[in-house]
Amino acid sequence: MLTLLLVALVPVGYFGYPLASTVLSLNHGTVAPGSGSLAAPGGAAPAPRGTVTVLLMGSDERHDKNGNVVAGDVAHSDTMILAAVDTDRKSVRLMSLPRDLLVSIPGYGPGHRINEAYTLGETNHLQGGGPALAVRTVEQLVGVQIPYYAVVTFDGFRQGVDAVGGVTIDVERPITDHDYPGDHFDLIPVYVPAGRQMLNGERGLWYVRSRHDDPMSDFGRNVRQQHFLTALSAKVLKPERIGQFGQFLDIVKNNLRTNLSPAEMLALGNAMVGTSKPRIQSYAVGPDLVRDPTPRQFALYGAVLIPNKTAIDSLVRAFLRGDPPPGGATPSPSGA
């Protein structure tokens, strides 16, 4: 998923423009070549100087053995994380957005879950497709321009994790999900025991994607996603792993859809040069920033989350500055 792009940025800074070109070369139409940054809507403000915002999405789009999208498949943005690459502090900040957040989607009006934007853009063949509409929707929510996006498939996630030999994670509580969405439009049971363990690509995907058994539901899943991202980043960027990076890049290239040009990707990678590990700070639109729907809202929209716009605005300000989230909680740095 989105992990692949973020992990790829740092070595690109070391190895240079040819490597960035390799990552972003066109393959099976999954990369948007030379599309450049998206035009921002009138109400969104630019990010602070030295900060580049990228909307990272994990897509459940499936491909056959020839790399073509499975006929009749409708892609969804199963994961949405807003990334802020701070070129001055050499750090990356990540803000998770819950998939059931009730928002207004440009051109479609209010009353939609935020993850519907990607699907609407894809199925209606809008300019820029699902990524562009998802970006405009998030810009409208947070009030900040997001010029770039990156979408990575679940297949890419599995292959990327396997390419580095798996990732060690301390699973805090066992994951038992009897309704996990499988690859063939079915629901399958999955289980990940508690404790420190090596997760391969398949089990890693279970860990970051399952939410039905988590008492915090999507909020708990968002925390697990950021933990996994941090652990994978640390493993990929170890000096002894440099020899495996070519294989990792091939996977990124084949499973990435982005409007970042090679030069732009190089610039983001260069932002991390000089630090042995990327400093990653975690933020989230958590349960304290939303409320449950009223009975009328539930009847209209189902089990959605109603955003507290004032509280989210405060979180976004802290996120862009790199300050602790409002309320005294501290971002979770990695590699500090």
Regions found by a protein language model. Give the residues of each.
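Non-catalytic, solvent-exposed segments at the cell envelope interface
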Residues: M1-A336
